[in-house]
Design a protein with these regions (language model features):
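Active-site neighborhoods and metal-handling regions in enzymes and metal-associated proteins
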Residues: 1-390, 394
Length: 394
């Protein structure tokens, strides 16, 4: 597909998204909606700057930004009226709303700070503008949760990139390398494979550190006879992937083998049982019940998964107290885990897309082989040299 054709397709998609958003705005009885979350601006307008405000009503589609991004916005968001503003909302929004005849303005309650909303409310009173601020959540996120074919294509490429990178990463995980060194090597692999940066800090957690679900790589040296949890992702054309595997250096002990098999069974059960129309807490229950029955329910302390798209964590959220409904077109992770404090943990994470009512697994990296050889990086180099010398002397 040529660049001009691809851009034309994306422009049509954004116009369609804007139409759906306007329907949602009308259904909520709002005159307009103010958006500031970067992923939502990108989704609706194509704007990639780090500072901007999108205002949408039945008649208006406005992208407001400061001097730094005006020219960029004109190039990326040609279907929107671009206005240059000061960065503080309260300095310009009340006057604009008054000029456009808006009286009920929705805003992203989970993204605008308390201080910003307070200053905006005070400015509305001071300027005697007839404007009611209405907190909203999830309006655009609901639209983003159903992936269009082009979006799914980008996500699939990001997943394939991580699959390929993991095969290379397994050669890095050896006794003697630190968690930080391994994480850096994995990041380099991801970038070399074509990832547009990384969507989150790579996790390499070994031994007891693998019992920390969101561990950060440390100076700890990876040793033989311990688990190593790897969590990484890639980004292609703005769309993310998310992936976890747990490896073991050498022959796994009985406890690790047990919890690994339980986690794998929990994940497989969830993948096979999840259906469109299912409540997300029911989806979580599919895996959680397996772990609870095995006696480890109290150490599976996070939800089963989360949506992935322009953000690495987005709607839907699959957890024991969530109540969203799954639908065809949603892309999300399935990542049960067991974490034994002071010993180690296991998490296995795949990405799936709901199609024809069932989950199709996007992630292809193997899960049934988790034990790695224990020779060190120095031994690995010596072994490769010996193999090379044997080939030369033949």
């Amino acid at each position: 597909m040529t660049n001009s054709l691809a851009e034309g397709t994306r422009r049509k998609s954004r116009i369609k998204r804007l139409r759906k958003l306007r329907t949602s705005i009308a259904e909520k009885g709002l005159d307009a909606l103010l958006l500031s979350q970067p992923e939502n601006l990108l989704y609706l307008s194509g704007f990639t700057g780090s500072s901007g405000w999108l205002l949408t009503s039945e008649q208006n589609a406005i992208l407001a930004t400061d001097f730094r991004y005006v020219e960029q916005a004109k190039g990326e968001s040609s279907d929107f009226e671009i206005i240059q503003t000061k960065r503080e909302l309260h300095n310009w929004l009340p006057g604009l709303a008054s000029d456009l005849g808006w009286h009920k303005l929705g805003f992203e309650a989970n993204f605008i700070s308390y201080d910003s909303s307070r200053k905006l409310s005070e400015a509305i009173k001071t300027k005697q503008v007839n404007l009611e601020l209405v907190p909203t959540t999830g309006i655009v996120e609901q639209l983003r949760s159903i992936k269009e074919p082009e979006e799914l294509g980008f996500i699939t490429k990001a997943v394939e990139l991580v699959d390929a990178a993991f095969e290379q990463a397994k050669a890095i995980i050896r006794p003697g390398i630190t968690e930080k060194e391994a994480a850096w090597e994995i990041e380099k692999i991801l970038r070399q494979e074509g990832s547009e940066g990384i969507p989150f800090e790579i996790i390499v957690a070994s031994g007891p550190n693998s019992a920390l679900p969101h561990a950060r790589p440390t100076e700890k040296t990876i040793c033989s006879g311990e688990p190593v949890l790897i969590d990484m992702g890639a980004r292609i054309s703005g769309y993310c992937s998310d992936f976890s595997r747990t490896l073991f250096l050498g022959k796994a002990d009985k406890t690790f083998q047990e919890i690994y098999n339980i986690v794998l069974k929990a994940q497989t059960t969830a993948i096979e049982g999840i259906e469109s129309g299912m409540d997300t807490s029911q989806a979580d229950r599919l895996a959680r019940s397996i772990i609870e029955q095995a006696g480890y329910g109290d150490v599976f302390g996070h939800g089963l998964g989360h949506g992935v798209g322009l953000a690495v964590h987005e709607f839907p959220m699959l957890g024991p107290s969530s109540s969203d409904l799954l639908a065809d077109g949603m892309v999300f992770t399935i990542e049960p885990g067991i974490y034994l404090a002071g010993q180690g943990g296991v998490r296995i994470e795949d990405m799936v897309v709901l199609e024809n009512g069932k989950a199709r697994v996007l992630t292809k990296a193997r899960k049934n082989s988790f034990q790695l050889p224990t020779f060190s990086n120095q031994q690995k180099s010596q072994r490769e040299d010996r193999m090379f010398n044997r080939e030369v002397t033949k």
